[in-house]
């Protein structure tokens, strides 16, 4: 559950959780979840909070215990790390910082470094995510890497 969290993170989460656990019951209401997450620097949408509640409130009591909250925060931080890594990888290719990378440059990298792909494989991948402009934005890049 919280094996990938540091003691410092757990303490920070416990402090934030306790601020909203007004009656010291060891749980917070579903409506307070988004506020707690925002106080910790995350920015979940209402839909994301609803999805998270469906996943972690398995007993349907509309309350989140600290252990459930830790598991949730651990997962959220992992997702944020992945998003940050993706953004950093994109920036490597986005030389001029305009939010776009050339499909030709990306093709060169994918066919020459790491697990080398063939021209045909790269062309197929680019065809699936590209809008035909010859450039790839961050969303298309994410879609490409998830293939």
Curated annotation (Swiss-Prot):
CDD domains: EFh. Ca(2+) 3 binds at residues 94, 96, 98, 105. Ca(2+) 2 binds at residues 57, 59, 61, 68. One of its GO terms (molecular function) is calcium ion binding. Coiled coil: none annotated. The keyword Calcium applies. Ca(2+) 1 binds at residues 21, 23, 25, 27, 32. It comes from the Eukaryota. One of its GO terms (cellular component) is myosin II complex. The keyword Calcium applies. Residues 8-43, 44-79, 81-116, 120-147 form the EF-hand domain. PROSITE patterns: EF_HAND_1 (PS00018), EF_HAND_2 (PS50222). Signal peptide: none annotated. It holds the Pfam family EF-hand_7. Keywords: Calcium, Metal-binding, Repeat. InterPro entries: CALM/Myosin/TropC-like, EF-hand-dom_pair, EF_Hand_1_Ca_BS, EF_hand_dom. This protein has three functional calcium-binding sites. Belongs to the calmodulin family. Calmodulin mediates the control of a large number of enzymes, ion channels and other proteins by Ca(2+). Among the enzymes to be stimulated by the calmodulin-Ca(2+) complex are a number of protein kinases and phosphatases. This is Calmodulin.
């Amino acid at each position: 559950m919280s094996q990938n969290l540091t003691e410092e993170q757990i303490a920070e989460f416990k402090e934030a959780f306790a601020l909203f656990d007004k009656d010291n019951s060891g749980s917070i209401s579903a409506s307070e979840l988004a506020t707690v997450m925002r106080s910790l620097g995350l920015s979940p949408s209402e839909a994301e909070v609803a999805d998270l509640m469906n996943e972690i409130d398995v007993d349907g009591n509309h309350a989140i215990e600290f252990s459930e909250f830790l598991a949730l925060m651990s997962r959220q931080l992992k997702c944020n790390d992945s998003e940050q890594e993706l953004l950093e990888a994109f920036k490597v290719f986005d030389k001029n910082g305009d939010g776009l990378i050339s499909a030709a440059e990306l093709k060169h990298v994918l066919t020459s470094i790491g697990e080398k792909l063939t021209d045909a494989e790269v062309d197929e991948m680019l065809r699936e995510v590209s809008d035909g402009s010859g450039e790839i934005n961050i969303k298309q890049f994410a879609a490409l890497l998830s293939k």
